[in-house]
Amino acid sequence: MKKKHSRIGLLASLAIHTALIGGTFAWLHNHKVKKLPSKTLFLWKWWQALLDEPQVAVAPDPITEEVKEIEPEKAEVPPEPKLTPEPTPEPDEFQILRLNPKKEKPKEEKRKERHHHKHKHRHKEKREELQEQEKPKDKPKERPKHHHKHIKALDAGPEIKQGIVAKAIPNAAEGEKVVAGVVGGQKNGSPNSTSTTGSANTGASSGNASELPAYKVALQRALQRKANNSYPQREKMNAENRYSYD
């Protein structure tokens, strides 16, 4: 089937092409174009016609001599003398004042001018005052309040309660407290004991008991002086200020 279709298409295309080519040839044969004479043929005929023309004798043109016309000489005219303008004297200041005297203004006009000038000056002053009033006044700067900082104690713990003496000598050895009412010279004696050791030490114990408070007072004063001298000046001032505010 494919071969048949291909053959039919080939034959149809050949028939169409032959018909188109034949039609173009037939149209050209019927409508022939007239050819124009070529340029070479025209030029050849023109040249041949020029050669065939008889030559005629031509007389030469007469020579015309050029005659120069003498122009009449122009009479020299003497130049006119230049007229210099005479210098005019400049007018003096006195002459100008005489010619143009100053016109004195009447008194009424002078009064009006003075009055007008005063009013202008007053208006200017009023405007300046109004402008100054309208300007926002600068608020006075508030001085910063001095807040006194509370100075915290550097020491913490049980040593704060002990006072300055404990600060001066932190690791001081404490002596034994005097116990009053020891019976028979024994620390934990009984009232029924009959030993004589307690009676022999009663005078010594009473003397030591009276000397100990005085010794403690003297020691405390010495330690207080030492602590005051070793205390820094700046902390002392801060402490005084703090106590004064409190």
UniProtKB/Swiss-Prot annotation:
One of its GO terms (cellular component) is plasma membrane. It is found in: Cell inner membrane. GO terms for biological process: protein transport. Residues 188-209 have a biased composition (Low complexity). Residues 67-79, 101-111, 126-141, 233-246 have a biased composition (Basic and acidic residues). Its main location: membrane. This is Protein TonB. Interacts with outer membrane receptor proteins that carry out high-affinity binding and energy dependent uptake into the periplasmic space of specific substrates. It could act to transduce energy from the cytoplasmic membrane to specific energy-requiring processes in the outer membrane, resulting in the release into the periplasm of ligands bound by these outer membrane proteins. Residues 112-125, 142-151 have a biased composition (Basic residues). Belongs to the TonB family. The keyword Cell inner membrane applies. The chain crosses the membrane at residues 8-28. Residues 67-158, 183-209, 225-246 are annotated as: Disordered. Keywords: Cell inner membrane, Cell membrane, Membrane, Protein transport, Signal-anchor, Transmembrane, Transmembrane helix, Transport. Residues 29-246 are periplasmic. Residues 1-7 are cytoplasmic. It is a single-pass membrane protein.
